[in-house]
């Protein structure tokens, strides 16, 4: 099975583990529009875009899958494959809430320009990446076993002291800067996956023996 076909479907924890994937969730951002897509694998397909953009409109059109306009914004390492599936599902649920049942409330919180539209520069609307970071933080509040977020850059995570101090079990690292984005990003994501698999497979340190009184 190709990675493209594999990425187009929802994958349960057992499948991810049998297929040799690490317990991770990937967050990609569109360089032109600021839109965000979540994936269980280090790639995504048009089918995922169709499922993640529930009610597209002129301010939030379905984006293209062209690889040159997408960049990995964050990779999240979780303690287990079950936790990675739970995080992915929760992120998708929050996206659905913003776009469908709570759309009016979400629209009221988005920064507007003088014409009442979502603020943008050219085609880029930063509100989508900001909402994705807020949703990621909210979901990680409930993550079991801690997590490590590999960010595109320090700026992308927001104010660390203000937004992340309440999550001491979440560690933060930063992806190396890339020149040839498509090729180098693929290699870096592969390295992160291999490292996360080794960490997941490593035995937990033994608990200290109880001391007699």
Curated annotation (Swiss-Prot):
Source species: Eremothecium gossypii (strain ATCC 10895 / CBS 109.51 / FGSC 9923 / NRRL Y-1056)
InterPro entries, per the entry: Ribosomal_mL67
Function per UniProt: Transcription factor involved in regulation of RNA polymerase II-dependent transcription. Also involved in regulation of mitochondrial DNA recombination, maintenance and repair, and generation of homoplasmic cells.
GO molecular function (one): structural constituent of ribosome
Name this polypeptide is given: Large ribosomal subunit protein mL67
Primary site of residence: nucleus
Gene Ontology BP terms: cellular response to oxidative stress; mitochondrial genome maintenance; positive regulation of mitochondrial DNA replication; regulation of DNA-templated transcription
Keyword Ribosomal protein: yes
Family classification: Belongs to the mitochondrion-specific ribosomal protein mL67 family.
Subcellular location as annotated: Nucleus; Mitochondrion
Pfam (any one): Mhr1
One GO cellular component term noted in the UniProt record for this chain: mitochondrion
Keywords: Mitochondrion, Nucleus, Ribonucleoprotein, Ribosomal protein, Transcription, Transcription regulation
Gene (name only): MHR1
Domain of life: Eukaryota
């Amino acid at each position: 099975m190709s990675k493209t076909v594999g990425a187009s479907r929802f994958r349960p924890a057992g499948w991810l583990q049998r297929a040799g994937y690490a317990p991770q969730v990937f967050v990609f951002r569109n360089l032109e529009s600021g839109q965000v897509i979540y994936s269980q694998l280090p790639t995504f397909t048009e089918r995922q875009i169709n499922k993640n953009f529930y009610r597209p409109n002129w301010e939030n059109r379905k984006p293209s899958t062209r690889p040159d306009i997408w960049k990995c914004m964050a990779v999240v390492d979780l303690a287990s494959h079950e936790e990675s599936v739970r995080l992915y599902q929760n992120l998708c649920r929050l996206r659905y809430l913003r776009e469908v049942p709570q759309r009016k409330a979400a629209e009221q919180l988005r920064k507007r320009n003088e014409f009442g539209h979502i603020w943008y520069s050219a085609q880029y609307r930063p509100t989508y990446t900001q909402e994705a970071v807020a949703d990621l933080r909210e979901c990680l509040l409930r993550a079991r076993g801690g997590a490590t977020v590999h960010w595109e850059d320090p700026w992308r995570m927001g104010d660390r002291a203000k937004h992340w101090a309440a999550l001491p079990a979440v560690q933060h690292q930063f992806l190396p800067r890339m020149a040839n984005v498509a090729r180098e990003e693929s290699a870096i994501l592969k390295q992160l996956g291999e490292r996360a698999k080794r960490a997941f497979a490593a035995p937990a340190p033994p608990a200290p023996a109880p001391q007699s009184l």
